[in-house]
């Protein structure tokens, strides 16, 4: 008996336009299954169908058979399906509701009426698997740590079918390979693991079957090597000329702590005007905190951050409003920045002009989404819209925190190409945090490697290959 079997499944949200058509697939226990495909093709819709979210929460026209352990779940309540299928969604912040790691993991187990002894055992087990401390505060976790937490919370509930929607999105290479190794071990122990993911280079060595979603259908891929080549294209790289440029930011002995927990200590480096600087480091090392300090969303506990935005080198600007208008920040979570009723209004809200907003939207491939509500988009589409909205303001300094999350390889290459073209045209300064080895070098003139809250290396892009080599060696 298959763990999951879909027979002649069709689905449309509006009753007219089919998202999936005549889908027939079978997934077994003891396997890791990869669901791949371009953004917006229906991968998440497939997840929602298998997990019972469609039609229990999300409406639409669903036909065909959706079998879990041989039983059709279309008429089942969501609570019944959830006892068989565990789901880790893309957006960690939408799933974390408790204050501590321990409470978050315990929450799902309590809803399943586990005994206190079993809950304690499950918490210990999954915390070891995911390298989490039970006492950590949920709101203080990095993006990668949050991803590991929601994965741990799902595994603790003990369903034998586990679906993960882009679980590697906020993980560095070592963390991504550690998670995939853990999932492979679970499959060998009898689980059915389903992973929806764009980072094929990391995932493929760990999976047993590969399914491609595209053109409304789902097909199994047998030639992985050619499939990887088809999904990959060469990224355009550019090199900025900034020899002799002044620092736009100069950090000297910067430290930052929350209560007694030190996050950064003695950070010193310059961001040169007109350069593309990439910040590297493992999850939780302080990269996002550095961006918040540079953009004045936080104040350093110690040290000095000098700025050269207002053509007057110093710590503070007399025209703070003007200063902030020259800084564009794209957060890790696009939901924090999407608040208008349509994509068009979102991108034009603070844009330099309506015409420029249209131009930027066209470049990022989101103009055709103008009539859509931002919150109705896929995570990859949300990311492109949030970046386009910030770029449309024409900032002198563009700060990007994990901009490629949720992008398939084609979308990633397009994003890198557009960002580099805009950088060349506007001579802006770009500061990017990324753990994505597929694009780091293509967005970089200078690299700053953060380790244990301080700068390990700062210099040219040669540090990128060194970082990812070490990152891969440190997995597990």
PLM region spans:
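Conserved ABC ATPase signature
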Residues: 137-145, 373-377, 381
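Catalytic Walker B motif of ABC-type/P-loop ATPase nucleotide-binding domains
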Residues: 162-166, 398-401
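H-loop/switch region of ABC-family ATPase nucleotide-binding domains
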Residues: 197-198, 434-435
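Conserved ABC transporter NBD signature motif
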Residues: 59-71, 303-315, 323
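Helix-to-loop junction immediately C-terminal to a conserved catalytic motif
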Residues: 51, 295
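Hydrophobic anchor residue at the start of the ABC signature
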Residues: 151-152, 387
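Conserved ABC ATPase "signature" region
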Residues: 117-134, 355-369
